Design a protein with these regions (language model features):
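N-terminal cap/lid segment of alpha/beta-hydrolase-fold proteins
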Residues: 1-29
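Primarily recognizes the serine-hydrolase "nucleophile elbow" in alpha/beta-hydrolase
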Residues: 104-168
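Short beta-strand/loop motif that positions the catalytic acidic residue
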Residues: 213-215, 219-222, 226
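Acidic catalytic loop of the alpha/beta-hydrolase fold
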Residues: 225-229, 253
Length: 282
């Protein structure tokens, strides 16, 4: 039976709380741990992600998912973008620090579940923007022993990478642009600090250099019909890390899921990616 504890508070960047979930079979045996990093405009429970988390736990892993400190949700409202000021002040280096805090917590005596975790066997799984964050963190942190990307970006320019010069100039002039959430119709603020953070840390945020330097096993999963992060990004990653394994399915950016997800099963594309990931990590 899978033991589930949801919305544990782990402090992230500037001590901002991150709701964190843990799933595992409590049979007294230490297990490898998978840490999942969600993407831009996402959150840990998107599309009933508990289904996926339970599957990992059933397969013998400790599975941990969390909300980045500045993703716009709060521990009290983990599935609602109620803190738009935090969302607008999010950036890649904040998320790297957040993920570092989660890894530290996993390995810390402050973690009441450490008894079940093999801290010598930590894997990162990152979706979309979270994939890019996971690539960089894997390159930086020797505690990470495996990396899996799902529909990952190949450069840290989400969502402004394809904006025309006029929009970039307006962003610099006003200090804020807005991203429209297609599901909630919210106008999500993006403060210019996002671009400034990228320019200030451009060398660190170079995904090509990061993935090229990784010495641990890598699995790259992507959909060939992904409109948000086209599959060419996966081929870039595979070119830069020739030792990586690659798995491509025919689906969209989220492998056929939607939010809310009210069913107790996964769409075929997500099921296939899940099974490939479990096989790779086992």
């Amino acid at each position: 039976m899978v033991q589930i504890t949801k919305n544990i508070i782990v402090n992230g960047f500037a001590n901002k709380p991150m709701g964190t979930d843990i799933f595992f079979k409590n049979d007294g045996l230490q297990k490898p741990v998978c840490i999942y990093a969600h993407g831009f405009n996402g959150f840990k429970d998107w599309a009933n992600f508990d289904i996926i988390a339970e599957r990992f736990a059933t397969a013998g892993f400790v599975f941990i998912k969390f909300n980045f400190s500045h993703n716009g949700t709060t521990p009290e409202q983990p599935e609602t973008f109620s803190d738009l000021e935090a969302f607008g002040n999010n950036n890649y280096t904040i998320q790297l620090e957040d993920l570092g805090h989660i890894i530290d917590w996993v390995c810390s005596s402050d973690n009441p579940y450490q008894f079940i975790i093999d801290t010598e066997n930590i894997s990162l799984i990152g979706h979309s923007m979270g994939g890019g964050i996971s690539i960089i963190k894997t390159a930086e942190d020797s505690r990470i022993k495996n990396l899996v990307t799902w529909a990952s970006i190949s450069e840290c320019k989400t969502p402004w990478g394809n904006w025309p010069d006029e929009k970039m100039n307006e962003w610099r002039r006003t200090g804020v642009e807005y991203y429209i959430n297609g599901r909630t119709n919210q106008h999500m603020p993006l403060h210019y600090q996002l671009y400034q953070d990228y320019r200030l840390h451009e060398e660190r945020l170079n995904i090509r250099h990061a993935i090229s330097s990784i010495q641990v096993p890598v699995l790259i999963c992507h959909s060939n019909l992904d409109a948000a992060v086209p599959v060419i990004n996966a081929y870039h990653l595979a070119k830069w890390q020739p030792a990586a394994k690659m798995f491509v399915v025919e689906s969209d950016h989220v492998f056929g899921r939607i939010h809310p997800w009210t069913w107790d099963y996964l769409p075929k594309a997500m099921e296939d990616v899940l099974m490939q990931t479990i096989k790779f990590l086992s």
